[in-house]
């Protein structure tokens, strides 16, 4: 059988055209699929962010409208001796005289929410204000009536003399040991050597 190059060339044109169409269609479909996946992912992320923001705003509004009050009495500022030179801790103030006031509520899960403001003497014996929102998951240990343990966080803003009282955002962990209306509540401020690494605590009275 004789093989005709002209015939082979003629037949190859529609085959190549057909293959090109299939490849183009496949590439186009893949591109559209990737685009739709990206759109759905972006939309899901945005919806989740919007949901978190809406929940936060709702919690702040409900706490602001709550009729319950709290009084705060700062009791200790302890500088972690494992992360400070002794010559520094010897000069630092660890009696944070001050006071604070807040509004609070317990939600349907018995979790604590608060909006608060506090002012106290910092490590250099200078006035330091702080305001913020606090949240704690609460746990009642066994049958110990009136006792509660809490772990959570605060989203706060503070200002210090050594930073010219420029507002500084300060998200921090929170914990508390509570009995009825009285609580011992505190936080730990992380840091580096000779900076931060401070345990700060206060008494809290609710009415």
From Swiss-Prot:
Site features described as Role in the phospholipid gating, chain residue numbers: 193
Enzyme nomenclature, EC number: 2.3.1.251
One Gene Ontology term, aspect cellular component: cell outer membrane
Keyword annotations of the record: Acyltransferase, Cell outer membrane, Membrane, Signal, Transferase
Subcellular location: Cell outer membrane
Catalytic function, reaction form: a lipid A + a 1,2-diacyl-sn-glycero-3-phosphocholine = a hepta-acyl lipid A + a 2-acyl-sn-glycero-3-phosphocholine; a lipid IVA + a 1,2-diacyl-sn-glycero-3-phosphocholine = a lipid IVB + a 2-acyl-sn-glycero-3-phosphocholine; a lipid IIA + a 1,2-diacyl-sn-glycero-3-phosphocholine = a lipid IIB + a 2-acyl-sn-glycero-3-phosphocholine
Signal peptide coordinates: 1-24
Active site: 79, 122-123
UniProt xrefs under NCBIfam families: PRK11045.1 (NF008271)
Name listed for the protein in its UniProt record: Lipid A acyltransferase PagP
Lineage, top ranks: Bacteria, Pseudomonadati, Pseudomonadota, Gammaproteobacteria, Enterobacterales
């Amino acid at each position: 059988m004789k093989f005709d190059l002209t015939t082979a060339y003629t037949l190859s044109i529609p085959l190549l055209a057909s293959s090109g169409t299939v490849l183009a269609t496949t590439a186009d479909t893949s591109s559209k699929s990737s685009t739709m996946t990206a759109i759905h992912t972006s939309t899901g992320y945005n919806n989740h962010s919007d949901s978190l923001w809406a929940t936060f705003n709702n919690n702040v509004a409900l706490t602001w409208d709550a009729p319950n009050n709290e009084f705060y009495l700062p009791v200790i500022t302890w500088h972690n001796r494992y992360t400070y030179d002794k010559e520094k801790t010897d000069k630092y103030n660890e009696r944070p005289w001050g006071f604070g006031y807040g509004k609070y509520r317990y939600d349907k899960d018995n979790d604590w929410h608060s909006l608060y403001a506090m002012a106290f003497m910092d490590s250099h014996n200078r006035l330091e204000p702080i305001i913020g929102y606090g949240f704690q998951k609460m746990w009642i240990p066994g049958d110990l009536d009136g006792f509660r343990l809490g772990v959570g966080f605060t989203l706060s803003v503070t200002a210090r003399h050594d930073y010219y009282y420029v507002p500084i955002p300060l998200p921090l962990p929170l914990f508390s040991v509570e009995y009825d209306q009285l609580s011992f509540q505190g936080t730990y401020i992380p840091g580096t050597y000779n900076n931060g690494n401070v345990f700060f605590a206060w008494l809290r009275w609710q009415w």
